């Protein structure tokens, strides 16, 4: 056990899907997995282990922001032997060609957080996903006939940022989506020799203020989860 995870040794699979919301972790486990067991519940940050098409997989929430997700990712990797983490979450779009309900595979993650600079001796760290995991996710999406966008995310420290001009810079540099965790998870995975990927559904458009309805969000979210889960099976076969 750790200060933040009360699961016994061996409770987690080697692959963990991580949404921000612990109740979303519960939903994923109950909807997509079989033989589900709740393995941790410290601070109501719920974690579950079950099987998907016979493959053992775990689901656990990571909270909001890089500090929170970094704690859980680090402890899962170093204390529970987790080898791969797939963050599954929502993001906002700043580009007119990236629409609400699009699914984004985060090949890299820029950030205004200083966490990776602290970790990397005050140098810039290129926070990138594992290529094989990203490729498997693209293959899973194609097999389902689902279009995905692949490219850079921006992991922001502030949800309510006063620097709205930064959205223009993000658009200029081709940022596909804005969220709050990918760069941190990629940094932790690199530091501890694990692998990570972020898959996001665009839930809001920052420019147009368009938002998904609850029903639309759920349907698109389910597509994203199936892509993530099927990508694990594809990765196993590679």
Swiss-Prot record:
Keyword terms, alphabetized: Glycosyltransferase, Transferase
GO MF, one annotated term: purine-nucleoside phosphorylase activity
Disulfide bond annotation, renumbered to this chain: none
GO biological process: purine nucleoside catabolic process
Site (Important for catalytic activity): 217
Domain of life: Bacteria
Top EC class for this record: transferase
Chain residues that bind phosphate: 20, 24, 43, 87-90
GO cellular component terms, semicolon-separated: cytosol
Active site annotation, chain numbering: 204 (proton donor)
List of residues binding a purine D-ribonucleoside: 4, 179-181, 203-204
Catalytic activity, reaction form: a purine D-ribonucleoside + phosphate = a purine nucleobase + alpha-D-ribose 1-phosphate; a purine 2'-deoxy-D-ribonucleoside + phosphate = a purine nucleobase + 2-deoxy-alpha-D-ribose 1-phosphate
Protein role: Catalyzes the reversible phosphorolytic breakdown of the N-glycosidic bond in the beta-(deoxy)ribonucleoside molecules, with the formation of the corresponding free purine bases and pentose-1-phosphate.
Assembly and binders: Homohexamer; trimer of homodimers.
Family of this protein: Belongs to the PNP/UDP phosphorylase family.
Designated name of the protein: Purine nucleoside phosphorylase DeoD-type
Species for this entry: Haemophilus influenzae (strain PittEE)
Gene: deoD
């Amino acid at each position: 056990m750790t200060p933040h995870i009360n699961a016994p040794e061996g409770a987690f699979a080697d692959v963990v899907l991580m949404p921000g919301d612990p109740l979303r972790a519960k939903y994923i486990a109950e909807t997509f997995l079989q033989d589900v067991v709740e393995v941790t519940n410290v601070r109501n940050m719920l974690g579950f282990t079950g099987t998907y098409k016979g493959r053992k997989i775990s689901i656990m929430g990571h909270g909001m922001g890089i500090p929170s997700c970094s704690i859980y990712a680090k402890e899962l990797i170093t204390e529970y032997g987790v080898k791969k983490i797939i963050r599954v979450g929502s993001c906002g779009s700043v580009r007119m060609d990236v629409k609400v309900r699009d699914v984004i595979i985060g090949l890299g993650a820029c950030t205004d957080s200083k966490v990776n600079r602290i970790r990397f001796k005050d140098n810039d760290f290129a926070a990138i996903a594992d290529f094989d995991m990203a490729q498997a996710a693209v293959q899973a999406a194609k097999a389902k006939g689902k279009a995905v966008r692949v490219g850079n995310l921006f992991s922001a420290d502030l949800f309510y940022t006063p620097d709205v001009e930064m959205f223009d810079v993000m658009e200029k540099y081709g940022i596909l989506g804005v969220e709050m965790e990918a760069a941190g998870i990629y940094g932790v995975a690199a530091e501890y020799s694990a692998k990570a990927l972020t898959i996001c559904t665009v839930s809001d458009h920052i420019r147009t203020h368009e938002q998904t309805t609850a029903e639309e969000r759920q349907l698109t979210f389910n597509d994203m989860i199936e892509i993530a889960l099927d990508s694990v099976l594809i990765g196993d076969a590679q």
